[in-house]
From Swiss-Prot:
<keyword id="KW-0689">Ribosomal protein</keyword>
<dbReference type="GO" id="GO:0005737">
    <property type="term" value="C:cytoplasm"/>
</dbReference>
<protein>
    <recommendedName>
        <fullName>Large ribosomal subunit protein bL36</fullName>
    </recommendedName>
</protein>
<comment type="similarity">
    <text>Belongs to the bacterial ribosomal protein bL36 family.</text>
</comment>
<dbReference type="GO" id="GO:0003735">
    <property type="term" value="F:structural constituent of ribosome"/>
</dbReference>
<dbReference type="GO" id="GO:1990904">
    <property type="term" value="C:ribonucleoprotein complex"/>
</dbReference>
<dbReference type="GO" id="GO:0005840">
    <property type="term" value="C:ribosome"/>
</dbReference>
<dbReference type="InterPro" id="IPR000473">
    <property type="entry name" value="Ribosomal_bL36"/>
</dbReference>
<keyword id="KW-0687">Ribonucleoprotein</keyword>
<dbReference type="Pfam" id="PF00444">
    <property type="entry name" value="Ribosomal_L36"/>
</dbReference>
<dbReference type="InterPro" id="IPR035977">
    <property type="entry name" value="Ribosomal_bL36_sp"/>
</dbReference>
<dbReference type="GO" id="GO:0006412">
    <property type="term" value="P:translation"/>
</dbReference>
Amino acid sequence: MKVRASVKKICRNCKVIRRNGSVRVICSEPRHKQRQG
């Protein structure tokens, strides 16, 4: 899980979603998981 000021899609499997007021990236590649904060 990377914590970043700006979350971006890295590959075509990445999806940007809002969960409990935080922006997250979920992906089939575990290294692409990000959250904003």
